[in-house]
Amino acid sequence: MSHSHPVRRILSPKDLEIFGASDTKKQVFGFVKVLNYYVVGKGNSYETLKHPIIGKLVAILDKVIDLVAKYPPEDATSSRFGKPEFRDFHQALEENAKDWISDLGELEDWQLVELCTYFAASFGDRTRIDFGSGHELNFICFLFCLRQLGLLDTDSSAAVLTVFVQYLKTMRAVQASYWLEPAGSHGVWGLDDYHFLPFMFGSAQLACHKYLRPLSIHDMEMLDMWKHEYLYMGCIHFINSVKTTASLRWHSPMLDDISGVKTWAKVNQGMVKMYDAEVLSKLPILQHFMFGQLIKAPEGVSPPPDPNAEVQHIHNHWADCCGIKVPSAIAASEMSQKPGDLRKLRGSGVLPFD
C-alpha cells in the first residue's frame, strides 16, 4: 500500500456537490452525531469506563501543551496578528507526532502516516498562522480514523468528555500563546473565533438539565459555577473573558440570539443542522478537507492538486478562509491592555459564516 499523505480533493463546487451526496460525508457526519448523542445529559465530570487509549490520547495532548512552553513567542507585543514562533511549534509537533501516535496501537506505516496527517492539521495552519472549524474538523477526522481502525470505542462519552475536552484545553493554550488568527475572520458574527463543536456538544450536555436554560448564559454567577462542567458554559465564559466589549449582544450577537431558544434540546438540534450546513457543506472549509485510505474520496471528485503548485483557495466572501487578516479576540484583548488601545480595529461587518 502507498504511504502517501491524505490529500485535498474538493477543489470545485462540483466536487463539493459530489461529496455532499457521498457515503464518506454520511460517515463523517454520522460520527459527529454519535459523539453528540453519547454526551446528552452528561457533564464533563461524568464517570464512564475508559479504554486505555483514552488516557494515551490525553497524554499526547499534554505533550502538545509542553511543546507550547518550549517555543514561546519572543516578543509578546510586537504584533496583534499571529506569532511566527507558531511555525516552529508546528514543525516540532509534526516531527514528534509519529512517535506519540505509534504508541496508540499496532499500526501499519500507511495508517500511521494518515493518523499523523490529520492530527498535525488539527492545530492550525503553519503557513497562515490561523485556526478555524476546518482544523477542528481534522481532529474529528483523527478520532474517526482511530474508530475505523478499531482503536477507539465511541459507544461511550469519553471521546468527548475526556479527549475532546482536553483537545479544547490544548487549543486554548496554543491560541493564547501564538495569537492564532481566526480562519475565515468571522469575528463577532460567528459562534466563536475558532470553534464550533464545543457549542454542539455543550448544548447536548445541557439538553436534560433541570434548571439551566439557554438564557442562563447571561448570568455571570451561573457561568462561573458551571464553566468547568459544561462545554457551552465554559465557552461563553471564555468568550466573555477575551472580548473587548462587555455585552454578549455586542460581541457575539449570534450566541445572544440563540439564548432566546426555549430549550437546550432545540439548541442542540439547531447546532447539528448548522454544523452540516456551515462546516460540512461549505467550499471555503472543505477545500482543505483531506482524503486517504481511511477517509476515502468519493468517486468523481477532482484528482489531487500538484503538490508543487501554489495552493489556490476559493472564497465566497471577502473574509473567507485566508482573505483578510483579522486579529483574534485573544490578541485584541491583550493589546487593549497596552498603550494605544487597538480594540476599535476589530471588524464587525462580516456576514455570518461563509
UniProtKB/Swiss-Prot annotation:
Disulfide bond entries: none
GO annotation, cellular component aspect: cytoplasm; nucleus; protein phosphatase type 2A complex
Reactions catalysed: [protein]-peptidylproline (omega=180) = [protein]-peptidylproline (omega=0)
Domain of life: Eukaryota
Location in or out of the cell: Cytoplasm
Keywords of this entry: Cytoplasm, Isomerase, Rotamase
CDD domains, A to Z: PTPA
Main location: cytoplasm
Gene Ontology terms describing biological process: mitotic spindle organization
UniProt cross-references to Pfam families, sorted A to Z: PTPA
GO terms, molecular function: peptidyl-prolyl cis-trans isomerase activity; protein tyrosine phosphatase activator activity
EC number: 5.2.1.8
Cytoplasm keyword on record: yes
Similarity section: Belongs to the PTPA-type PPIase family.
Protein name per its UniProtKB record: Serine/threonine-protein phosphatase 2A activator 2
Organism: Yarrowia lipolytica (strain CLIB 122 / E 150) (Yeast)
Organism phylogeny: Eukaryota, Fungi, Dikarya, Ascomycota, Saccharomycotina
Gene giving rise to this polypeptide: RRD2
